Design a protein with these regions (language model features):
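N-terminal targeting sequences that direct proteins away from the cytosol to non-cytosolic compartments
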Residues: 2, 19-77, 82-84, 101-102, ...
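Soluble periplasmic/extracytoplasmic beta-strand elements of cell-envelope proteins
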Residues: 78, 89, 161-165
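Second-shell loop/turn segments in exported
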Residues: 88-97, 149, 173-174
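Signature of long, low-cysteine stretches enriched in small and polar/charged residues
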Residues: 105-161
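Sec-dependent bacterial lipoprotein signal peptides
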Residues: 1-21
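Residues at beta-strand starts and edge strands
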Residues: 9-10, 48, 73-75, 84-86, ...
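N-terminal segment of the mature soluble domain
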Residues: 79-90, 102-104, 108-113
Length: 174
């Protein structure tokens, strides 16, 4: 019996010591993403009430349906970025035909009401430029379907809203 205890003790000790390897510190890291060279082209199509610059590796596509319905005006577009499997949905509304406060409230609802439960943080960043346009950029953290949304307006005639979506499952750590 005494011999069995000694053999068992030696076996367990050998097992524990043989499986131990020196700890190697691993730095936190992220995937290296090679971004293409920054080159832009101008979207300035006749009949559209807005213009902007977008990357040369992206495509602007007219958006003609909204959840199976016809869009309320012909100025809704999508900016597709195939190399990143992403799309920016752009909707445009005329302030004169819509209540300005209602447009602002809807933009905030699209960010906060739909994402508050799953977002780990929502960071609103004011936007101002020299063309009398202002708005808000929202950076959303966590398991949200979209990480970036924004709206721009001149508060009298134009209201433009956008949201960026990636064709991928959202992961909290990405």
């Amino acid at each position: 019996m005494n011999q069995r205890v000694v053999i068992f003790f030696l076996f367990v000790t050998t097992l524990i010591l043989s499986c131990n390897s020196p700890y190697t510190y691993k730095k936190k890291g992220y995937f290296k993403i090679d971004f293409p060279e920054k080159k832009y082209q101008v979207f300035d199509q006749p009949g559209y009430p807005y213009r902007f610059e977008y990357p040369v590796y992206a495509n602007v596509v007219k958006d003609s349906t909204f959840f199976g319905e016809v869009t309320e005006n012909p100025w809704w577009i999508n900016i597709d970025v195939p190399m990143f499997h992403s799309r920016i949905y752009i909707s445009y509304k005329q302030v004169g035909k819509n209540n300005f406060d209602s447009l602002i409230n809807d933009a905030y609802k699209m960010v906060y009401k739909q994402h508050t439960e799953v977002a780990t943080g929502i960071d609103p960043i004011p936007i101002e430029n020299s063309h009398n346009a202002e708005g808000m950029y929202f950076s959303l953290g966590g398991n949200t379907a979209t990480a970036n949304q924004f709206f721009l307006t001149d508060s009298t005639r134009h209201f433009l809203r956008g949201s960026l979506y990636f064709d991928a499952t959202p992961n909290e750590d990405s």
